[in-house]
Amino acid sequence: MGSVLFAAVFIALHFATGGLANPDAKRLYDDLLSNYNRLIRPVGNNSDRLTVKMGLRLSQLIDVNLKNQIMTTNVWVEQEWNDYKLKWNPDDYGGVDTLHVPSEHIWLPDIVLYNNADGNYEVTIMTKAILHHTGKVVWKPPAIYKSFCEIDVEYFPFDEQTCFMKFGSWTYDGYMVDLRHLKQTADSDNIEVGIDLQDYYISVEWDIMRVPAVRNEKFYSCCEEPYLDIVFNLTLRRKTLFYTVNLIIPCVGISFLSVLVFYLPSDSGEKISLCISILLSLTVFFLLLAEIIPPTSLTVPLLGKYLLFTMMLVTLSVVVTIAVLNVNFRSPVTHRMAPWVQRLFIQILPKLLCIERPKKEEPEEDQPPEVLTDVYHLPPDVDKFVNYDSKRFSGDYGIPALPASHRFDLAAAGGISAHCFAEPPLPSSLPLPGADDDLFSPSGLNGDISPGCCPAAAAAAAADLSPTFEKPYAREMEKTIEGSRFIAQHVKNKDKFESVEEDWKYVAMVLDRMFLWIFAIACVVGTALIILQAPSLYDQSQPIDILYSKIAKKKFELLKMGSENTL
């Protein structure tokens, strides 16, 4: 029981001494704020100007919303001023030279963000202020600001944006509060490095290139007094890897697909389908672009220009493809090829485009040697052994007589005896026998045609010798000749028809090859001219966030140590 009582007394004494551990600070707080009015500007004379120094320490660049044109930042708003009512002698208060007090208990300058975009113009988290015995007050509250930032999408996604944050007193004019930058000199209102980046966390989307600040003194038409403000500028350069991989490379690939349309054969029937598919793909990219950039009419973004250029190429390729297909399926029935078209697209352009048309294979007129199995040596005067009947019949019907050499070939091919054609011709003065039926037999023809002779020769001789047999045989022969002529003419017309169709197809192929080269050159040149006009591609300046940020330096040192340990 005694030990428990001792412990309770010890704890009570400990808390009692702890509560009175800093009586000087409590006494100082009571003395400073007992008669303090936080609503009155802390100056000895109402005409005196109170100098307020302000700075900005950037912690994070949270977001740059292109579509809504809002920049979200996490900053510390550093403010300093002198309050003559908050001075004391440290010797009178046990050597206490600084005091932390709630900011709600002292006078604060009403500094707000002019270009605010979400309704909170001032600091929302009221942290404590630090009071120095000289009367100096330091207040560094954190804040998350959403400020309006005019987005310039001309070179998107290879763009640089300059956003600003404008701070100033909302009610006090320049005669009451003299607003200055923490690093400002007496002879200049411009500060080269106006934002402190020591505690900045590197952004994965933006590089900070410049952070100047400028102090402005403006006169408005409503008032005679000047109003002071400080503008903090942030020049941001986009890291383009994300948009290059997800937008630029797919767009370039789709644009070059329009070139392959002309390499696709016209007979495949897929040329128009490929063009329409490319147009639909470009439409999807247009929708993605419209979701990213603000709906501005001031300028067309770089990626939008490239998509428009690609869409024009694809649309033109559709028109050209339709024309090429029209040429490919032309025929002699509907179109006649002009001489200049034949000369230009069949003779001249193929040589320039390195197109070689396969030559047509001519049919071999000579028979193969194995056909002439029964004929070894033809006499040089074989043409004189021509049947009289063939001469006369050919003269009557305009059919050329079969040369003797061909007769020997026919005999060899058909297994007909060669001596069937080797008989001497009948004399023209040979008397015609009567209409006796016995005379039409092969043996009755004066023995000139042997039984082993070909039937055609026997029939020809019989027709020549017999007037009765001549007329019906001539009529049948005439019908046969007319049929043969019709078939031959039909085959000839068909070959000519197919030849003209092949010429049109060849012209279409030449057009395809010509437009393939034209569109390939247009795609390469257009891509280079549009993409390479972005100034940031040639800007070799290094971002300053890596130079000033202690967090970034520490991170790089850790990465370097890790890589060295790995090696």
Curated annotation (Swiss-Prot):
It is found in: Postsynaptic cell membrane; Cell membrane. Residues 1-21 form the signal peptide. Disulfide bonds join C149-C163, C222-C223. It is a multi-pass membrane protein. CDD domains: LGIC_ECD_nAChR_proto_alpha-like (cd19031), LGIC_TM_nAChR (cd19064). The chain crosses the membrane at residues 241-264, 272-290, 306-325, 514-532. Residues 22-240 are extracellular. Its main location: membrane. Keywords: Cell membrane, Disulfide bond, Glycoprotein, Ion channel, Ion transport, Ligand-gated ion channel, Membrane, Postsynaptic cell membrane, Receptor, Signal, Synapse, Transmembrane, Transmembrane helix, Transport. One of its GO terms (cellular component) is synapse. Pfam families: Neur_chan_LBD (PF02931), Neur_chan_memb (PF02932). Residues 326-513 are cytoplasmic. CNS in embryos. Glycans are attached at N45, N233. One of its GO terms (biological process) is regulation of membrane potential. GO terms for molecular function: acetylcholine-gated monoatomic cation-selective channel activity; excitatory extracellular ligand-gated monoatomic ion channel activity; transmembrane signaling receptor activity; transmitter-gated monoatomic ion channel activity involved in regulation of postsynaptic membrane potential. Belongs to the ligand-gated ion channel (TC 1.A.9) family. Acetylcholine receptor (TC 1.A.9.1) subfamily. After binding acetylcholine, the AChR responds by an extensive change in conformation that affects all subunits and leads to opening of an ion-conducting channel across the plasma membrane. This is Acetylcholine receptor subunit alpha-like 1. It comes from Drosophila melanogaster (Fruit fly). The gene is nAChRalpha1.
